[in-house]
C-alpha cells in the first residue's frame, strides 16, 4: 500500500514517463490510491474506478473500531495528495467492467480491488455466518455501527476468534476490555 520509495523521500517524482501512458486503477482503497497517485506523479494519465461512494477502502472501514480511529488519517492524506494531481481522474460509484476499462485505452491496469475475509473450511461455519451466529470482521464492524454491541453486550460472553493475525487481535482488543472471555484459534 505504501510507496516503497518513501525511504528515499520523493526521489521517484523526479522520474517521468518518456511517452504518453494511460493507467486504469480499479479500486480506491489505500493501495489503489497510492498506485494512482504515484503513476500520476510520474506523468501518467490515471483513471481510478471505485464502486463505492467514497475512497479509502478497508482502512476507512476498520477505522470504525474505537482503537483504530487514526486509520482514517492515511486515506485522507492520499485523497489530499490525489486532489492536487490534474492528470488523476477519480470515478466514484463506478463498478469497473472490461468494456469500461477498455474505453480508457490503458497501457497498464492495476487491480486494487481489496480482499474478503477468509472463511476457513470448518464444517458448519458458513451456515452459522448466514444465520448470524458467527461474524466476519465486516459483520462485526457493521453491527458495531448499527449499535448492536452496547458496552454491556460483551460482559460474560464467550468470544472465539479464528485467526491470530492483526485482524483477529483487533477483534480481541474490542471484546476483552468489555468483559468477554476471549479465545483465539490460529
Residue ranges of predicted features:
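Residues in the short beta-alpha loop(s) of Rossmann-like NAD(P)-binding domains
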Residues: 52
